[in-house]
């Protein structure tokens, strides 16, 4: 979450992580976004399932397990109509949904690269879960681009 936040910090965003059950567990918020009325309803402990909030990125991704963007009036409740929310699923080492990573902002903020950044961050979390699950085993890591291989991080369990 922190890596994603630092990539988009200062651009009026909130990063959020919810469990597979749609309950918001943690957020990191730009001050500019945190001061908005919309941000006041996005806080740890709130429930974002489709059953309780209608169409929203966190709840819909928790339900479908696929990445999604919900923009403005696509939200079920009008109170969230000024937001754009981009979410991606996070799966554990066994392929079970572990949670949902989300980046939310007001609809006027630039969204050009956010989808890719959220998906990449979700993949990084999944890699960490996989490494943790298999930390007592020898892992062989292959990639066509060497800059994506970080043996020191893999072997230290980070």
Predicted feature locations:
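Intrinsically disordered, low-complexity terminal regulatory regions
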Residues: 1-49, 60-69, 82, 91-157
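Phosphate/pyrophosphate-binding betaalpha-module
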Residues: 50-54
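Helix-to-coil/beta transition segments that act as allosteric "coupling" elements at the rims
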Residues: 75-91
């Amino acid at each position: 979450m922190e890596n994603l936040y630092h990539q988009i910090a200062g651009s009026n965003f909130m990063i959020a992580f919810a469990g597979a059950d749609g309950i918001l567990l943690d957020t990191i918020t730009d001050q500019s976004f945190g001061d908005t009325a919309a941000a006041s309803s996005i806080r740890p402990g709130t429930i974002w399932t489709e059953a309780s909030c209608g169409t929203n990125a966190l709840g819909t991704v928790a339900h479908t397990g696929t990445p999604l963007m919900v923009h403005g009036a696509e939200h079920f409740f009008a109170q969230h109509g000024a937001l754009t929310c981009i979410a991606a699923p996070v799966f554990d080492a066994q392929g079970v949904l572990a949670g949902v990573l989300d980046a939310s902002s007001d609809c006027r903020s630039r969204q050009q690269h956010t989808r890719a950044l959220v998906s990449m961050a979700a993949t990084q979390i999944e890699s960490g879960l996989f490494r943790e699950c298999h930390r007592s085993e020898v892992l062989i890591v292959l990639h066509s681009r060497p800059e994506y291989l970080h043996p020191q991080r893999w072997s230290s369990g980070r």
